[in-house]
Amino acid sequence: GIEAASVAERFDDESIANNGDWLARLGALKSYDEAVVLDVTASKDLAQRYVEIAQQGIHLISANKVAGSADSQYYHQVQDAFAKIGRHWLYNATVGAGLPINHTVRDLRESGDEIVALSGIFSGTLSWLFQQFDGSVPFNDLVDLAWQQGLTEPDPRSDLDGSDVMRKLVILARESGLDIEPDSVKVESLVPEELRELSLDDFF
């Protein structure tokens, strides 16, 4: 295993920059019984390679919500790609900060229960922001503070524009047995239009 206290140091010493061929190199590994990719990003580009990951015979554990909330065609394509070769695509970390919510919802449905409603606080970021905001600190400063503390998505506009909650709702709805598309969820953005296309540096 890896000692938690040494993770940052080992990453600095041993990490290898992505030069584009990492997936082929992983697929070529023959000295291990199983290989696993951990996707802890919010990258759309990486989510678009999930089928390739399956085709390399690699398991995938993902906190990335993009594939699980993609259009139904791609979502089922990814599911089928892993199922066909007996590999796992595990994505419980996409909703609930690691709590077994996806698994619980799926287990209820598969045991014959009818899920009629799901309710909760679906954005820890927005919950924190509105708990803190009392007018004494500008809202944009609170957003910056939340980002610095790792409470937001890599780009906090994903929290503020509603897309992060939309993705979680789509994932949970699908786990509940609904056939739903992302554009079925009505989203109202809190991000002013003039800030939506700026770089992250310019946004802050």
Range-by-range predicted roles:
Residues L60-I61, W89, E153:
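Hydrophobic beta-strand scaffold residues
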Residues G1-Q55:
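N-terminal glycine-/serine-/threonine-rich beta1-alpha1-beta2 phosphate-ribose binding loop
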Residues S43-Q56, K65-A93, A97-L108:
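Rossmann-fold NAD(P)-binding glycine/threonine-rich loop
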Residues L38-V40, G68, D159:
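A generic secondary-structure micro-motif detector
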Residues D33-E34, G57, G86, I115:
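A general structural motif
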Residues Q132-F133, N140-F204:
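Substrate-binding/catalytic subdomain of NAD(P)-dependent oxidoreductase enzymes
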Residues A83-G86, L90-Q149, S163, I171:
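Rossmann-like NAD(P)H-binding beta-loop-alpha module
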